[in-house]
Every structure is written in structure tokens, then in C-alpha cells.
């Protein structure tokens, strides 16, 4: 098994497809933006899952975390959709997706089924699945449940579940925020403006606020109530007894300034993989690594996918 551990900007030099010009400027030669489509899939329990789709080619599914929405991928999508079919979900409870009541409706098997419903709605048998934060937890679990439907797996920030318990044990104070989210009524402390406080992009911030106003704060907290381990207990929905090896190429990207999920959680990730495994640790990036280091993250993802795309 090939094991590649990359630090800082070591992947920045990976070649991307060059834009050929014949005298005109790069801006003139640039392709027009690919149109975005608002679409819906119906999950196994009847919940409607909204997603934004664009492009054609191998399917890439993007899954956001908390607090976020499908717009999280606004910088990545145009880097991919000239050669890939890119779909970005609003996970259940968020923005334009269904918002069922009750903790049980946010258990991991239902979140995994939502992703499967989107892939099915696209008429595909396989996809690359990419997730950040809760989206990464969903992506790991999608791999465990549907390895045969994966082309590749891309994870931002969240350790493999086998290592997650170790991180909780070694740095319990870093998960205090999650314990607070699990408390009854915690959603009453949330506002759309507060949830969007981390967003630095002036153009995107109003879009985040509007998306959060359309979302269910109770649903956001139910992700933690249904799936995050309580107290000092080991992970439950995140931790099946025996993890299957990740039998597809795996890319893991982590911002080393992340204070909720520490970089040490990714140690030994390669032991959980049966195919080539690439880890990119970015010293300057925080938890929202796809925003903090967008150029490096997006360029890496494109180059990594291109290198693993079957020859025509």
C-alpha cells in the first residue's frame, strides 16, 4: 500500500490542466461558468434532500458539516465541474432540505441513506464522496456501508472513527462544546447571525445567514444528540465493532489550527486503508480548512482526483 504524508504546501506544485491560449489573455480564454441546477432526492424515509448539481463526468458528492450548508463548496465546485458531475447537499435539517422532528431522525444510518438517495437520483452506481465535519463523519460511514459504490473517499478534518475515541480520551476538553450541544434546549441559544460568525467571505456571509434562517436549529443539535458519544462513553453510531478497510483511494486534509479536532487524531489512518492513502496537514488552516486554505485544498483535490481517474 502506498502511503503519502504531505505537509504544508507540498501538494501545491501538483500539475493542473493548463489553459491553452492562442494570444488572448487567460481571462478571455477561461471557460464560462457551468450552470448550477437545484435538485431534490427522496431519502428512504421520505425526507426530501436538496442538492446543487453541475457539470458532467464522474460523480463527486460534497457533504457539509456544522454550521454550514451546500454553499460551503462554492469555491471548490467550479474547480471540478468542467470535468466532473459535482453535487453539493444540504444535509437534512439544513437550508432547503427536509427538517423532520425528533432525535432519531438524525441517526447516522439515516444520514448515510440521504447520500445514497442523491447518488441514486443522479442515476449513478458509483461516486467519489467528500465530506467536512459532520459531512466527513457521514462520508466515513457511507464508506463502511457502501464501499462498493465508492470511487474515492475524501475527508476534511474528522479522524477515522477508529481514532476518534482516542482523541476524545486524550483531549476531552476539546469536545466540551459538543456536550453542551447535546443538552436539551441548546438550540435556543443559537441564531443565524451567530452561526455565521465564522464566515470571513463578505459576499458569502449574507447567504449563510439566509440559509441558517431556513434551517432547523433543533436538527443541528440532534446530530450531536443522536451520534456523538455522551460523557466518557465511546462513539456509538460512529463506531461499528469492526471497521472494514477503506478499499478505495483515500485523501485526508486537516487544518492544524483546528481546536476541536486535533491533528493527532489522524495518526495511523493508513492502517485503516487498503488502497493508496494521502494525508495533507495544513499548518495555517483552522477547522474550516476548505475556506481557510481554499486554493491549496481545491487544487489538491482536483489534482488528486485527476491522477486517479481511469484512462479513457
Question: What do the predicted segments below correspond to?
Answer:
Residues 39-44:
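Short acidic-hydrophobic surface loop/beta-edge motif
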Residues 20-31:
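Bacterial Sec signal peptide processing site at the extreme N-terminus
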Residues 16-18:
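C-terminal motif of bacterial Sec signal peptides marking the signal peptidase cleavage site
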Residues 1-6:
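Bacterial N-terminal signal peptides that target proteins for export
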Residues 47, 52-96:
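Conserved HGGG/HGGXW glycine-rich cap/lid loop of the alpha/beta-hydrolase fold
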Amino acid at each position: 500500500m502506498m502511503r503519502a504524508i504531505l505537509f504544508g504546501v507540498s501538494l501545491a506544485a501538483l500539475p493542473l490542466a493548463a489553459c491553452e491560449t492562442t494570444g488572448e489573455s487567460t481571462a478571455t480564454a477561461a471557460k464560462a461558468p457551468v450552470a448550477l441546477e437545484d435538485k431534490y432526492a427522496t431519502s428512504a424515509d421520505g425526507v426530501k434532500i436538496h442538492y446543487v448539481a453541475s457539470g458532467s463526468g464522474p460523480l463527486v458528492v460534497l457533504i457539509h458539516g456544522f454550521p454550514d450548508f451546500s454553499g460551503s463548496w462554492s469555491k471548490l465546485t467550479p474547480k471540478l465541474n468542467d470535468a466532473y458531475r459535482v453535487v453539493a447537499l444540504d444535509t437534512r435539517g439544513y437550508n432547503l432540505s427536509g427538517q423532520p422532528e425528533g432525535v432519531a431522525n438524525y441517526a447516522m444510518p439515516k444520514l448515510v441513506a440521504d447520500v445514497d438517495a442523491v447518488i441514486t437520483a443522479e442515476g449513478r452506481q458509483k461516486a467519489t464522496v467528500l465530506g467536512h465535519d459532520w459531512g466527513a463523519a457521514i462520508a466515513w460511514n457511507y464508506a463502511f456501508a457502501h464501499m462498493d459504490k465508492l470511487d474515492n473517499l475524501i475527508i476534511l478534518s474528522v479522524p477515522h472513527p477508529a481514532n476518534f475515541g482516542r482523541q476524545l480520551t486524550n483531549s476531552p476538553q476539546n469536545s466540551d462544546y459538543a456536550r453542551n450541544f447535546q443538552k436539551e434546549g441548546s438550540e435556543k441559544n443559537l441564531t443565524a447571525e451567530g452561526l455565521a460568525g465564522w464566515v470571513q467571505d463578505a459576499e458569502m456571509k449574507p447567504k449563510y445567514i439566509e440559509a441558517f434562517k431556513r434551517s432547523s436549529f433543533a436538527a443541528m443539535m440532534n446530530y450531536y444528540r443522536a451520534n456523538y458519544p455522551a460523557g466518557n462513553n465511546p462513539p456509538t453510531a460512529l463506531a461499528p465493532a469492526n471497521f472494514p478497510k477503506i478499499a478505495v483511494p483515500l485523501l485526508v486534509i486537516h487544518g492544524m489550527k483546528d481546536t476541536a479536532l486535533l491533528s493527532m487524531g489522524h495518526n495511523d489512518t493508513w492502517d485503516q486503508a487498503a488502497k493508496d492513502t494521502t494525508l495533507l496537514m495544513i499548518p495555517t488552516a483552522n477547522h474550516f480548512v476548505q475556506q481557510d486554505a481554499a486554493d491549496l485544498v481545491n487544487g489538491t483535490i482536483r489534482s488528486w482526483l485527476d491522477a486517479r481517474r481511469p484512462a479513457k
